[in-house]
Amino acid sequence: MGIVDAVGWAGATAAVLFMLVFTVDGWTRTGYRPDYHPVSALALGGRGWLQKANFIVCGGGIAIGSLALIEVSILLTLGIGVFGMALIASGVFTMDPMRSYPPGTPAGNPASFSRRHELHDHAGMVVFATVPIAAGIATFTPQLSDPLRVYSAVIAAVVTVGFLAFGQAWENDSARTGLWQRLTILVGWSWLAVLLAISA
């Protein structure tokens, strides 16, 4: 296995591991509702270190994994690299406690947000924006196979819709906010894992 293969598989593994960790962690957290609370809320509380590490380690793995695509498309490499770095930033700058999590936190949003929370929001916007952008780039990358390009086109559309639905659910404090986010992550990160694995 060469260096390109190794970094590609590292990135693919990181994308899958990220989903696995937040899924298991969310199922086993007291007071945490996966269908309602966002993934980022797992970085709060006594076990918050686990999701912080998940953001940072998996973000780093994906950023490194993007290098497997450098001979395929520099734009695609940059897009996925930025995604990975934004994921790292999401772990460094955590969201504020809100909406009944961690347990004992009042329902709803706080009267004001910390600078750390604002930086987390900015990083999250980059994370969710770069997936459909990268998928769109992949759609028009002739070095990729036709099936992968079609798959990428579908992902670009689906993740865009999912991101908008999640954003609307968040603004409305919907009981299904976490569900929309998780579905969007599952679709987008799975595509990313497939892309990096194929490129390895």
PLM region spans:
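Hydrophobic, aromatic-enriched alpha-helical segments typical of multi-pass transmembrane helices
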Residues: 2-38, 42-200
